[in-house]
C-alpha cells in the first residue's frame, strides 16, 4: 500500500481529537526451520504490519499477502506494559508487551526507499516519552 493512501486510511481510523504522530512498517520474519519443511514457500509466512502512533495510543494494521489491510487493532498507551527496543541499522527489533500478557515481536524498518514509511528518530523519542521503554 502506498504511503499516502496509508496516511489517509490511518487518519480516518483516528478517534475524535486524536492526532497522528507517525507510522512505520514492521515485519515478523518467517521461522527459519519452516524453510527446511516447505522450502521457498516459507517466505509466504512473513507477516507485515503498519504501526501508527497517535496522541492516545497505538494502531496496528495487519496486512495480507497482496498488501491490503486485513485487521486493525488499537491499544491505548496504558494497555502496553513495555516496549523493548534493540539496536539495528536497517531494521530495529521491537517487542511490544501488553497488559493482557500477549506480546508482539517485529522488526521495524529504519532505512529504505522513500515510499516506505520508516521508524524515525523523532518517533522513537516520542515512543520513549509515552511508553515504558527498555533499550
Residue spans for each PLM region:
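Residues in well-ordered beta-strands of folded domains
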Residues: 23-27, 97, 107
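Short, surface-exposed beta-strand/loop "edge" segments at domain boundaries and coil↔beta transitions
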Residues: 5, 30-34, 59-60, 102-107
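Canonical phosphoinositide-binding patch of PH/PH-like domains
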Residues: 100-122
Amino acid at each position: 500500500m502506498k504511503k499516502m493512501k496509508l496516511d489517509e486510511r490511518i487518519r480516518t481510523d483516528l478517534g475524535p481529537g486524536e492526532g497522528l504522530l507517525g507510522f512505520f512498517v514492521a515485519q515478523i520474519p518467517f521461522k527459519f526451520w519452516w524453510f527446511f519443511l516447505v522450502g521457498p514457500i516459507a517466505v509466504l509466512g512473513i507477516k507485515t504490519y503498519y504501526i501508527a502512533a497517535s496522541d492516545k495510543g497505538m494502531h496496528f494494521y495487519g496486512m495480507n499477502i497482496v498488501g491490503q489491510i486485513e485487521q486493525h487493532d488499537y491499544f491505548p498507551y496504558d494497555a502496553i506494559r513495555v516496549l523493548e527496543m534493540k539496536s539495528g541499522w536497517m531494521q530495529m527489533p521491537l517487542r511490544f508487551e501488553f497488559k493482557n500478557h500477549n506480546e508482539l515481536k517485529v522488526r521495524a524498518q529504519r532505512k529504505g526507499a522513500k515510499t516506505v514509511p520508516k521508524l524515525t528518530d523523532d518517533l522513537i523519542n516520542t515512543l520513549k516519552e509515552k511508553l515504558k521503554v527498555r533499550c
